[in-house]
């Protein structure tokens, strides 16, 4: 860029005919006169730093700074002072002369910043620059501390820095330190300020060359169209528009350095980083040209745009597509098969759960020889002599009959409804004869037992009649199925022509007596053993009772639909479900286990049950921790209360002692309302009576394990 500046400065001189060399240095006053305006703050910082650096490092010779004309700017960016033309005879101490130079430099910089302004006009400076000039200008060299200080002594400087800043700048080092501290990188202060001074020098030469060229152009225009005499003073032409051109030049340089905005949307944000002064604007423009940071316009060739430039991007893309091989039709394309998604472990488990459990097929010859099974629990799980009361094996053998082969002991689970239907169908197809229509019922109660006795008696009486007699009455649907003897039971189920009628009083007497079935005939004894054991009623669990009770309670709640307030209070648990007493606002009443309704403490009973899942707890193992706390004024049925109290007796044993294997893991107490207590007491009583009947009934050859459950007459729900 020095070449550009030099060429610009030499052009007017070549035009004038005098070939003068480019100046190597310029005074600060010449720079101010060329620009016709003061220097900016960045240039003032640079002149101060470079001036202190140049004055401190220059060899001997007396140098004085009286005005801006004594400060010299050089092409390489250094700054010096003009030598004193007249020799001085007075000897000045080094420290005193350095302080005077610092003070004179501060005055000169202030005049450069205030150059061209009126007397009543003052320029606003930044606080840092104003403080620096104030410290440099107010340094008094006649101070006693200044005259007595040694050149190599830096004690006061350290004290001043420790106090938060110097009170006066008397040395070049102090001024340079303050100039460097304002930069983000104090270590690069020398390079930065040298670049600023170099740019100021080069731009001044370029501006002076530009103004000289403008002045020469105006003179040429005046000579070509001059009609007035040439005695017009040349100074008037020189000063014509000089300030305007200088101002435009400074504005142009600023825009080239800081960037140009085509449209000012908002004010430029303050950039804390210093402006780059390593290159002049022309050098930066040349660097952009070399790096091709520009966009070229369309160039016409022979009055037309070249064909490669004329085509737009869309046409080029179409040409490229046409040059490629043709694509296949969609119908001809074959996609790869979708890879089979591997099922996760969670999906496999869900699929196994959804699938029905498949049973292993059993031969038809074993269906007739099986008993009615046992309860759904494992007999082998009970170790020692203590057997689970829910594991009952009813498959017995009859050794008294020579024509019947012994039945194997098989432990079966209670079949489902679908399996029972299949078993009934297969038994009807295989059995050629059937005399008594009997079917097991899941809820086998005392009423069903009495009905079974009457139906069996009537069936045997009809079997004793001739073949042309009346047809025996059919059993109620859903409770018993038609029983027909198999081939192995021919010994005790004779054909109508060969069978001998039994006395009509034999079966009722044997059915009415629980302890004396041994005296009955083998046929009657077999029928009693097969159909008098309500096995599936023993398999009734707490979970099933809870489901039944919920259905009943839901039906009972429909009665209160007319009274919406009562129905809402019962549903939300605001009142007791038994006594209709209202609960306090911030209370937490207990909830019944079976009906899930809120109940007060006076209407609730603590029920004892094993610490197991509800689906694994037989209902006959439940007990009550305390008697039912029901006042006599409540509308509780008297029969239910009497049935509950009749279960108590002088000889009682707790449920933990009766069922130690079930209560092996402890027990829990649950709250039950009085209504559900009566319901559960009836279910438990019926279940235990059925178990008593089962235990009191003798087995063939005594091969089955009896239940360790005492009589209900001496049983207590505890």
Swiss-Prot record:
This is Protein spire homolog 2. Binds to actin monomers via the WH2 domain. Belongs to the spire family. It is a peripheral membrane protein. GO terms for molecular function: actin binding. Residues 26-207 form the KIND domain. Residues 1-22, 143-166, 397-434, 456-518 are annotated as: Disordered. Residues 538-558 are annotated as: Spir-box. The keyword Phosphoprotein applies. It is found in: Cytoplasm, Cytoskeleton; Cytoplasm, Cytosol; Cell membrane; Cytoplasmic vesicle membrane. Gene3D superfamilies: Transferase(Phosphotransferase) domain 1. Acts as an actin nucleation factor, remains associated with the slow-growing pointed end of the new filament. Involved in intracellular vesicle transport along actin fibers, providing a novel link between actin cytoskeleton dynamics and intracellular transport. Required for asymmetric spindle positioning and asymmetric cell division during oocyte meiosis. Required for normal formation of the cleavage furrow and for polar body extrusion during female germ cell meiosis. InterPro entries: KIND_dom (IPR011019), Spire (IPR029901), Znf_FYVE_PHD (IPR011011). The modification Phosphoserine is found at residues 374, 443, 445, 479. It comes from the Eukaryota. The gene is Spire2. Its main location: cytoplasm.
């Amino acid at each position: 860029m020095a070449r550009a500046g030099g060429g610009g400065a030499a052009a007017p001189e070549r035009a004038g005919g005098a070939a003068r060399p480019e100046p190597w240095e310029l005074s600060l006053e010449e720079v101010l006169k060329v620009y016709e305006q003061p220097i900016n703050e960045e240039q003032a910082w640079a002149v101060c730093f470079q001036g202190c650096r140049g004055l401190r490092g220059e060899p001997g010779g007396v140098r004085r700074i009286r005005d801006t004309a004594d400060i010299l700017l050089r092409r390489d960016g250094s700054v010096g002072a003009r030598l004193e033309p007249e020799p001085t005879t007075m000897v000045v101490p080094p420290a005193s002369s350095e302080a005077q130079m610092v003070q004179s430099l501060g005055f000169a910089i202030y005049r450069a910043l205030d150059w061209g302004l009126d007397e009543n006009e003052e320029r606003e400076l930044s606080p840092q620059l104003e403080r620096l000039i104030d410290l440099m200008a107010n340094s008094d060299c006649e101070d006693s501390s200044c005259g007595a200080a040694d050149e190599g002594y830096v004690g006061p400087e350290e004290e001043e820095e420790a106090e938060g800043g110097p009170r006066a700048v008397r040395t070049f080092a102090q001024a340079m330190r303050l100039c460097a501290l304002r930069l983000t990188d104090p270590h690069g202060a020398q390079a930065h300020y040298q670049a600023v001074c170099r740019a100021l020098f080069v731009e001044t030469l370029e501006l002076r060359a530009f103004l000289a060229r403008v002045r020469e152009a105006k003179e040429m225009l005046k000579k070509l169209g001059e009609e007035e005499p040439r005695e017009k003073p040349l100074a008037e032409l020189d000063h014509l528009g000089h300030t305007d051109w200088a101002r435009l030049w400074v504005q142009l340089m600023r825009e080239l350095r800081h960037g140009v905005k085509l449209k000012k949307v908002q004010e430029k944000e303050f950039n804390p980083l210093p402006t780059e002064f390593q290159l002049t604007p022309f050098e930066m423009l040349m660097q952009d040209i070399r790096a091709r940071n520009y966009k070229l316009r369309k160039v016409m060739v022979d009055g037309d745009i070249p064909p490669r430039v004329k085509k737009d991007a869309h046409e080029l893309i179409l040409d490229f597509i046409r040059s490629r091989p043709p694509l296949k039709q969609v119908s001809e394309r074959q996609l790869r098969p979708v890879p089979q998604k591997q099922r996760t472990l969670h999906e496999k488990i869900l699929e196994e759960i959804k699938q029905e459990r498949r049973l292993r097929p059993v031969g038809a010859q074993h269906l007739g020889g099986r008993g009615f099974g046992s309860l759904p629990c494992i007999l082998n799980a009970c170790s020692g002599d203590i057997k689970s009361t829910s594991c009952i094996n009813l498959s017995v053998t009859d050794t008294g009959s020579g024509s019947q082969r012994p039945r194997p002991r098989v432990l079966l689970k209670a079949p489902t409804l679908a399996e029972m239907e299949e078993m009934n169908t297969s038994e009807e197809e295989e059995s050629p004869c059937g005399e008594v229509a009997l079917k097991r019922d899941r809820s086998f109660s005392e009423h069903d037992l009495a009905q079974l006795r009457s139906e069996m008696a009537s069936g045997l009486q009809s079997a004793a009649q001739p073949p042309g007699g009346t047809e025996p009455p059919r059993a109620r649907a859903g409770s018993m199925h038609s029983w027909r003897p198999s081939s192995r039971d021919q010994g005790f189920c004779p054909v109508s022509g060969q069978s001998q009628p039994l006395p009509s009083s034999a079966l009722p007497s044997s059915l009415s007596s629980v302890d004396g079935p041994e005296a009955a005939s083998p046929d009657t004894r077999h029928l009693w053993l097969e159909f008098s054991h309500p096995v599936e009623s023993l398999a009734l669990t707490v979970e099933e009772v809870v489901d039944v009770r919920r259905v009943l309670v839901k039906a009972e709640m429909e009665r209160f639909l007319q009274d919406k307030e009562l129905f809402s209070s019962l549903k939300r648990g605001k009142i007791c479900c038994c006594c209709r007493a209202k609960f306090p606002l911030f209370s937490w009443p207990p909830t019944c286990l079976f009906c899930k309704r809120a109940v007060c403490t006076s209407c609730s009973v603590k029920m004892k049950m094993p610490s197991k899942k509800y689906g694994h707890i037989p209902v006959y193992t439940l007990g009550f921790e305390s008697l039912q706390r029901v006042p006599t004024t409540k509308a509780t049925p008297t029969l239910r209360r009497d049935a509950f109290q009749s279960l108590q007796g002088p000889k009682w044993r707790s449920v933990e002692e009766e069922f130690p294997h079930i209560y092996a893991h402890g027990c829990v107490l649950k709250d039950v309302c009085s209504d559900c207590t009566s319901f559960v007491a009836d279910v438990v009583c019926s279940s235990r009576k059925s178990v008593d009947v089962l235990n009191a009934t003798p087995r063939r050859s005594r091969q089955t394990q009896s239940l360790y459950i005492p009589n209900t007459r001496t049983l207590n729900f505890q």
